[in-house]
Amino acid sequence: MSRLEQRFAELKAEGRSALVTFVTAGDPGYDASLQILKGLPAAGADVIELGMPFTDPMADGVAIQLATLRALEAGQTLAKTLQMVREFRVDNQTTPIVLMGYYNPIHRFGVDTFVAEAKAAGVDGLIIVDLPPEHDAELATPAQAAGIDFIRLTTPTTDDARLPRVLERSSGFVYYVSVAGVTGAGSATTEHVTEAIARLRRHTDLPISVGFGIRTPEQAANIARLADGVVVGSALVDKIAQAKSADQAVTDVLSLCSALAEGVRGARR
């Protein structure tokens, strides 16, 4: 059983949703980013999505675009992101880490090298936003052969004809993007999310995590009553942007994570 399967199974047995947190690797700098990464599990993160900085993050809103820029300016590379995961795994063997980003940096790095190094580092899954199922042979197939889950995004515009194709080779969990548009956009209604999850359940037994537009503990709790996972990214990344120092960024991100975790964990009581 993979770390992702194990984590979602444990939480299902506990009767609660997972808090899935997103931060960009190397933001605001390597050391502070590693501190945040290492601190997230104790602050209540059940699964961590770690963004791989790329110069053209087209699916991301302003907050994550700026985070990517800060990370790149601080010298973050894909090799350093893998190193960050290796350092995280020295002390934490249980929290799943999913790398999220775009195909171009992986293609430049070399797919076979990337898959081997990601597996060795302790990466559990990949979310590659610009690589549709038609291109599975390029990365999804070798990643899954190495034991790395390949997580698909579904959206309000993914119709019933397309959905089985998207979900066919998905593993780990399904990431439902509750709002059409870029990250950090407005949030979806409870009714919309309820209907969307019911539709997805007709096509897959995988855990369903819902993200985009979730910023507060109250919003996180509302989604946690419905979904297997609640994804929060832009709200955490904003804390880094607003911080006056790297130390403050670490403190503020972990503080918000704790508040979100409280919302998620209390949602079904």
From Swiss-Prot:
Q: Coiled coil: which residue ranges? A: none
Return the EC number.
4.2.1.20
CDD domains (UniProt xref): Tryptophan_synthase_alpha
The residues the entry assigns to the signal sequence are: none
Q: One GO molecular-function annotation for this sequence?
A: tryptophan synthase activity
Q: What pathway does the annotation place this protein in?
A: Amino-acid biosynthesis; L-tryptophan biosynthesis; L-tryptophan from chorismate: step 5/5
- Superkingdom of the organism of origin: Bacteria
* EC supergroup of this enzyme: lyase
List the InterPro entries hit by this protein, alphabetically. Aldolase_TIM (IPR013785), RibuloseP-bd_barrel (IPR011060), Trp_synthase_alpha_AS (IPR018204), Trp_synthase_suA (IPR002028)
Keyword check for Manganese: no
Listed A to Z, the keywords are:
Amino-acid biosynthesis, Aromatic amino acid biosynthesis, Lyase, Tryptophan biosynthesis
GO terms for cellular component: cytosol
> What's its catalytic activity?
(1S,2R)-1-C-(indol-3-yl)glycerol 3-phosphate + L-serine = D-glyceraldehyde 3-phosphate + L-tryptophan + H2O
Q: Which residues form the active site?
A: 49 (proton acceptor), 60 (proton acceptor)
The subunit structure is: Tetramer of two alpha and two beta chains.
NCBIfam families membership: trpA
Q: What does this protein do?
A: The alpha subunit is responsible for the aldol cleavage of indoleglycerol phosphate to indole and glyceraldehyde 3-phosphate.
Family recorded in the similarity comment: Belongs to the TrpA family.
Q: What's this protein's name?
A: Tryptophan synthase alpha chain
Provide the species name: Pseudomonas putida (strain ATCC 700007 / DSM 6899 / JCM 31910 / BCRC 17059 / LMG 24140 / F1)
